[in-house]
Amino acid sequence: MVRGKTQMKRIENPTSRQVTFSKRRNGLLKKAFELSVLCDAEVALIVFSPRGKLYEFASASTQKTIERYRTYTKENIGNKTVQQDIEQVKADADGLAKKLEALETYKRKLLGEKLDECSIEELHSLEVKLERSLISIRGRKTKLLEEQVAKLREKEMKLRKDNEELREKCKNQPPLSAPLTVRAEDENPDRNINTTNDNMDVETELFIGLPGRSRSSGGAAEDSQAMPHS
């Protein structure tokens, strides 16, 4: 008689479940013993029944095997974590390197380099992106120029306002009179006249006779010759 295949699901009947547990438990304990003897393996088996009863088997000592397991897992989990971190860092670095290479290739294509390997679709896509970039650049340039023009206009208006204020101030101020300079020689005109008169000497003596004769050489003789005898 061929036995049917047992379905791997929870047995709903409590009695059948308990019978199956007892059979499988004994078989599991037997297999653990055979494994420890035939393969010289350290085996520890702990089983709790549905009612909470403990069944165990250990080739050496259950407690020692548990401590060995804890030590092993602690060391290997730490090493495994470090190794996983290293592998993750390497994977991230490789991914970043690939992205950087792709960006460099795309940059060269935008600059018009290495276009021999591009298809028509790729070239068209590059053309569209370049046109969009140019539109964005021109828009930004126009905006900056408009801002500069607005600043210059504000500066012009301010200068005009300052100029008008200066003009109003100049209109309200009285005109400046020319400074009066008095020459030293004009302060005392009488002194100038006296000085001039002092410097002018006029001889009023009368000379009778021929011109060119000196009074000192023969003034008396000439007077005697010129006068008629009585």
UniProtKB/Swiss-Prot annotation:
Cited SUPFAM superfamilies: SRF-like
Q: Name one GO biological process term.
A: cell differentiation
Source organism superkingdom = Eukaryota
Record keywords, A-Z? Activator, Developmental protein, Differentiation, DNA-binding, Flowering, Nucleus, Transcription, Transcription regulation
Q: InterPro entries of this UniProt entry?
A: MADS-box/MEF2_TF (IPR050142), MEF2-like_N (IPR033896), TF_Kbox (IPR002487), TF_MADSbox (IPR002100), TF_MADSbox_sf (IPR036879)
Q: What is known about the tissue distribution of this protein?
A: Expressed in mature leaves and at low levels in roots and young panicles.
Subcellular localization is given as: Nucleus
Say what happens when this gene is deleted. Answer: Late-flowering phenotype and elongated internodes.
Q: Which function does this protein serve? A: Probable transcription factor active in flowering time control. May control internode elongation and promote floral transition phase. May act upstream of the floral regulators MADS1, MADS14, MADS15 and MADS18 in the floral induction pathway.
This protein is called: MADS-box transcription factor 50
Give the organism, scientific name.
Oryza sativa subsp. japonica (Rice)
